[in-house]
């Protein structure tokens, strides 16, 4: 939703602690309301790619750390090491620390470890998401970022790929803003989502990348108001966000042509009103 609090600008909340890439903050709020932030990536002389993430607990105002940050330890790491995109979520009392592996060891994946303590140490368990591919062909690039959420009894992983920039399965390639006929694939990432499933022992099944995305879990109510961005499929339409400092972002839809531009919603329940 729209943020209401002012951003804390002009200063950091904690140092980088020798981490090479001091970026990709991941925010986790525990059941008791306590907030934690993870960050990091890359590799430095003091922080190799087996020890390149930090975690810190924030105060109640969420604008300063409580104590010093600590290294996120992941035991039993395989050949694929940690690159970036740290993220924590919790499921049935267990903490899951996930991250993107590096392209240096092959196609990047989203791997994870588990712990009974949010600060760790974690034990590596497996891969949540392989390199997004379809029909044996990668639809991604040299990295990935993700988020995990539970919604109405279902678990979902949101991630990025380059399926639109690559024109996967006939998808419409939207021209870059600079007028080029085809954008640079590496810098045009598409946001995708698929359902995620747990095994009985709490481990996560490797997510199947799909064209369709998750199944619809509720009917669409046509008698409510929705942003025009809401659709299950669209053609010839680009969504844009106009950002003005100090104001809420204005989201707009722009047709790419004067005809044959459309959007669709699915699973609509008209009830008895449509038939009288």
Annotate each predicted stretch with a short phrase.
Residues 1-276:
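Carbohydrate-active catalytic/glycan-binding domains of CAZyme proteins
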């Amino acid at each position: 939703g729209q943020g209401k609090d002012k951003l804390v600008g002009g200063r950091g909340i904690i140092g980088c602690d020798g981490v090479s890439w001091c970026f990709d903050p991941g925010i986790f709020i525990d059941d008791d309301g306590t907030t934690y932030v993870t960050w990091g990536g890359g590799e430095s002389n003091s922080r190799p790619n087996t020890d390149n993430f930090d975690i810190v607990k924030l105060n109640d105002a969420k604008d300063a750390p409580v104590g010093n940050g600590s290294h996120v330890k992941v035991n039993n790491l395989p050949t694929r090491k940690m690159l970036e995109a740290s993220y924590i979520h919790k499921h049935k009392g267990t903490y899951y620390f996930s991250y993107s592996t590096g392209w240096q060891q092959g196609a990047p994946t989203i791997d994870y470890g588990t712990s009974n303590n949010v600060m760790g140490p974690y034990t590596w368990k497996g891969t949540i998401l392989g390199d997004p591919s379809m029909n044996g062909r990668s639809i991604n690039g040299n990295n990935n970022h993700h988020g995990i959420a539970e919604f109405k009894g279902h678990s979902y992983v949101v991630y990025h790929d380059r399926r639109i920039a690559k024109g996967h399965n006939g998808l419409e390639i939207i021209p870059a803003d600079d007028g080029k006929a085809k954008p640079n694939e590496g810098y045009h990432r598409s946001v995708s989502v698929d359902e995620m499933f747990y095994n009985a022992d709490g481990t996560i099944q490797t997510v199947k990348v799909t064209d369709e995305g998750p199944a619809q879990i509720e009917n669409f109510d046509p008698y409510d108001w929705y942003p025009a961005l809401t659709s299950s499929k669209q053609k010839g339409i680009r969504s844009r966000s106009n950002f003005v400092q100090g104001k809420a972002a204005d989201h707009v839809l722009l047709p790419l042509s004067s005809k044959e531009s459309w959007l669709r919603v699915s699973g609509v329940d008209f009830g008895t009103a449509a038939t009288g």
